[in-house]
Design a protein with these regions (language model features):
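Extended, charge-enriched "interface" segments that sit outside catalytic cores
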Residues: 2-61, 65-66, 77-83
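Function-dense linear segments that define catalytic or interfacial modules
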Residues: 65-101, 223-314
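Well-ordered mid-protein domain cores that form the structural environment of catalytic cofactors
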Residues: 85-125
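Glycine-rich phosphate/pyrophosphate-binding loops
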Residues: 128-129, 133-151, 341-360
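Extended, Lys/Arg-enriched charged tracts that mediate electrostatic binding to polyanionic substrates
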Residues: 148-223
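Alpha-helical support elements that line or immediately flank enzyme active sites
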Residues: 289-296, 328-337
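Core structural elements
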Residues: 316-328, 351-355
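Conserved small/polar residues in nucleotide/adenosyl-binding loops
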Residues: 370-377
Length: 381
């Protein structure tokens, strides 16, 4: 059941207020999309109370945190699922009926979040649901794709693939967490400098994007617990180069913005050509680097000794795509935290766990050494 006593009249008033404040309309004038958004924001208000309570409880308990890293999460529609897990579906259905709103029509209005495609993504979503229901402290970590893969239309008897613009009207269940944004660097070269008698590897000449997290609630079934799916969007560090634009170099003026947008456009871009292989590698490194950076920063908010990182954090790597987390954690521990290689490797081994989904060679993703060297950030790899 809902943690607090459900008040039908308060819920109905909140729906009406959301329609008014979001769209400057009366309830009876609202479209189905506007009603869906208004009701979803009302439900999110209920969820947020439990979300805050959950995070406060975790902070007091200081449990080990699982970061479930996956290229995809096939979550399904959120409105009905959240209400079922809150134990509030029947009560909300009744309240909406009194407003003349059909809850089934609202559920049909919601697009499927285009964050996953098949069994790999569905398994990831099921794990997140189970972790919340069992009361484990966990984050899902992935990419906030703008178009996912595609949606199908049948025209003249043939399948036509078109972009799945699931974010066209926004996602009412997500919260942008700009305060946790981090920089992710690609390419460049490495200078070796001496600091306090130690070699320090300094990356220079790189391209970078700003990784911005969006949090979605994962509601546990009947237990008031709400965990987090954190999906990362890419933004340009500098959106617009006015100097290039004034020189007539219009493509160069938006080069950084285009780089950022490309990273999060689609799930599994075609990799039959080199540009596609490069984009996939960038996608994987992008969300892994952002997630690892944030996990370390969160750990250091309450713990002083990075050498005990593995005692409080586990990275669960869902198939081959996120395995670059091993290299990224090593890079940060050695280059930024100043640990020796063997010590960092021991921590990394105890932190990273891997889920294998197949033994077929053609399904196990690989990256050529030559291709990887083009994007390496260590001169001695």
């Amino acid at each position: 059941m809902i943690d607090k006593q459900f008040d039908k009249e308060t819920f109905k008033k909140s729906v009406k207020d959301n329609v008014k404040f979001l769209y400057r309309r009366k309830l009876e004038e609202a479209t189905q999309e506007q009603l869906f958004q208004a009701v979803s924001y009302t439900v999110k208000d209920v969820i947020i109370d439990n979300w805050l309570d959950t995070q406060n409880a975790y902070e007091k308990q200081d449990p080990k945190i699982v970061y479930y890293m996956s290229m995809e999460f096939l979550m399904g529609r959120a409105l009905g699922n959240n209400l079922l897990n809150l134990g509030a579906y029947g009560e909300v259905k009744e309240a909406l009926e009194e407003l003349g709103i059909d809850i089934n029509a609202l559920e049909d209005q919601e697009p499927d979040p285009a964050l996953g495609n098949g069994g790999l993504g569905r398994l990831a979503a099921c794990f997140l649901d189970s972790l919340a229901t069992l009361g484990y402290s966990a984050y899902g970590c992935g990419i906030r794709y703008r178009y996912g893969m595609f949606k199908q239309k049948i025209e003249n008897g043939y399948q036509v693939e078109v972009p799945d613009n699931w974010l066209k009207y926004g996602n009412p269940f997500e919260i942008k967490r700009d305060e946790y944004a981090v920089e992710v660097k690609f390419g460049g070269y490495v200078d070796v400098e001496m600091h306090n008698g130690r070699q320090k590897f300094v990356q220079k000449g790189y391209q970078s994007v700003r990784a911005v997290p969006y949090d979605m609630p994962i509601v546990g079934y009947g237990n008031h617990i709400v965990n987090t799916l954190r999906i990362w969007d890419a933004e340009a560090i500098n959106n617009f180069n006015l100097d290039s634009f004034d020189k007539g170099e219009y493509q160069k003026a938006v080069e950084q913005e285009n780089l950022a947008r490309t990273i999060c456009e689609v799930l599994y871009p075609n990799d039959n050509h080199m540009a596609g292989k490069e984009l996939r590698l960038k996608q994987q490194y992008f969300f892994i680097s952002a997630s690892v950076q944030r996990a370390i920063a969160k750990y250091k908010e309450t713990h002083d000794d990075i050498r005990k990182f593995h005692e409080k954090v586990t990275f669960q790597l869902n198939d081959t795509h996120p395995t670059v987390a091993v290299a990224e954690l090593m890079r940060i521990l050695v280059d930024e935290e100043g640990l020796e290689w063997d010590e960092a490797w021991e921590i990394t081994r105890k932190t990273c766990a891997y889920t294998n989904h197949t033994i077929m060679a053609e399904a196990l993703e690989t990256v050529s050494y030559t291709h990887l060297r083009a994007h390496e950030t260590r001169s001695n790899l």
